[in-house]
């Protein structure tokens, strides 16, 4: 019985450490063009918000508008280099395809619906940088809510 409890404790600790590590990662840092886009915008990794900060919405209250805009410009740069965006316009179909490929989401998955909702909510925004950050924040927040609801189920 002690061994079983120890295994559960170790599993819970590893799961928590993994989730904490992901939330500490910088938004977009897993993508190929991250460093290029940082350089193009004169930013460093320290200037970019963490996934946890964005998914919880803390980035909106903890940072100045210029920091929000700069982070958005890096997101837009990566989306554009990946062919998902041109200026302030999304390629919605390609964005869905890439999202499905990246997440392994299946038809009917709530994450795809969340992406569609986030694209719809931001599609008329004119500033490409603000639009990109708000889209990324919307998707990350939706994923966090969906993950929390599936853990409680």
Swiss-Prot record:
Keywords: Behavior, Disulfide bond, Pheromone response, Pheromone-binding, Secreted, Signal, Transport. Homodimer. Colony queen number, a major feature of social organization, is associated with worker genotype for Gp-9. Colonies are headed by either a single reproductive queen (monogyne form) or multiple queens (polygyne form). Differences in worker Gp-9 genotypes between social forms may cause differences in workers' abilities to recognize queens and regulate their numbers. It is found in: Secreted. One of its GO terms (molecular function) is pheromone binding. Transmembrane segments: none annotated. The gene is Gp-9. This is Pheromone-binding protein Gp-9. Its main location: secreted. InterPro entries: PBP/GOBP, PBP_GOBP_sf, Pheromone-bd_protein_Gp-9. GO terms for cellular component: extracellular space. The keyword Transcription regulation does not apply. Belongs to the PBP/GOBP family. GO terms for biological process: response to pheromone; social behavior. Pfam families: PBP_GOBP. Disulfide bonds join 37-77, 73-129, 118-138. Residues 1-19 form the signal peptide.
């Amino acid at each position: 019985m002690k061994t079983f409890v120890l295994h559960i404790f170790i599993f819970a600790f590893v799961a928590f450490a993994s989730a904490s590590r992901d939330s500490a990662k910088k938004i977009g840092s897993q993508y190929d063009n991250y460093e290029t886009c940082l350089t193009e915008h004169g930013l460093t990794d320290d200037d970019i918000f963490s996934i946890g900060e964005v998914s919880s919405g803390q980035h909106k209250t903890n940072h100045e508008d210029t920091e929000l805009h700069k982070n958005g410009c890096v997101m837009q740069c990566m989306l554009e280099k990946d062919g998902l965006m041109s200026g302030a316009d999304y390629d919605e179909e390609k964005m869905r395809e890439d999202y499905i490929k990246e997440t392994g989401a299946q038809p009917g998955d709530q994450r795809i619906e969340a992406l569609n909702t986030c694209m719809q909510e931001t599609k008329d925004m004119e500033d490409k940088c603000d639009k990109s950050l708000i889209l990324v924040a919307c998707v990350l927040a939706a994923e966090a809510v969906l993950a929390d609801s599936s853990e409680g189920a």
